[in-house]
């Protein structure tokens, strides 16, 4: 995401909101990411712009109230007439169903599109993957779902 931001390949005013079970601050997330983000000389200000476009909150995957709070956090950044939302899911199969259901029920955009990006493989085997795919199809239209291979990224 840093490279896309750095190279101006994302829409202006894009915001990044991290959501996970881990209770931590954005400063802690930033510190943990330092060793993975390559910053060339002269890009320090751009990196600060990137971090200013980030937010983080922790919550459970199975409690709708946490997703309602996530929706409030997202909404505070949506100032214009159009506000698209993309959810990138890199979650264990055990929480996939709860996470997608709560996104659908509490975090769908009312001012633009909602997309869900899912890292494959998801599920423990073909059978569980098929079950998760059917659940997903009941929550989102096919054009809202993007599947990517974790290893090919």
Curated annotation (Swiss-Prot):
Pathway: Carbohydrate degradation; pentose phosphate pathway; D-ribulose 5-phosphate from D-glucose 6-phosphate (oxidative stage): step 1/3. InterPro entries: G6P_DH, G6P_DH_NAD-bd, NAD(P)-bd_dom_sf. GO terms for molecular function: glucose-6-phosphate dehydrogenase activity; NADP binding. Cytosolic glucose-6-phosphate dehydrogenase that catalyzes the first and rate-limiting step of the oxidative branch within the pentose phosphate pathway/shunt, an alternative route to glycolysis for the dissimilation of carbohydrates and a major source of reducing power and metabolic intermediates for fatty acid and nucleic acid biosynthetic processes. Pfam families: G6PD_N (PF00479). The gene is ZW. One of its GO terms (biological process) is glucose metabolic process. Its EC number is 1.1.1.49. This is Glucose-6-phosphate 1-dehydrogenase. It catalyses: D-glucose 6-phosphate + NADP(+) = 6-phospho-D-glucono-1,5-lactone + NADPH + H(+). Coiled coil: none annotated.
């Amino acid at each position: 995401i840093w490279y896309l931001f750095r190279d101006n390949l994302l829409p202006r005013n894009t915001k990044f909101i991290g959501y996970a079970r881990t209770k931590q601050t954005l400063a802690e997330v930033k510190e943990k990411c330092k060793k993975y983000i390559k910053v060339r000389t002269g890009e320090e200000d751009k990196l600060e712009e990137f971090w200013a476009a980030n937010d983080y909150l922790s919550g459970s995957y199975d409690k709708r109230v946490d997703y309602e709070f996530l929706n409030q956090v997202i909404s505070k950044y949506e100032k214009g007439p159009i506000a698209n939302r993309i959810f990138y899911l890199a979650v264990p199969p055990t929480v996939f169903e709860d996470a997608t259901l709560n996104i659908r029920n509490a975090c769908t955009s009312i001012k633009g599109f909602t997309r869900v990006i899912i890292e494959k493989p998801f599920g423990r085997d073909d059978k569980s993957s098929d079950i998760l795919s059917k659940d997903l199809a009941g929550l989102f239209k096919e054009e809202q779902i993007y599947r990517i291979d974790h290893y090919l990224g």
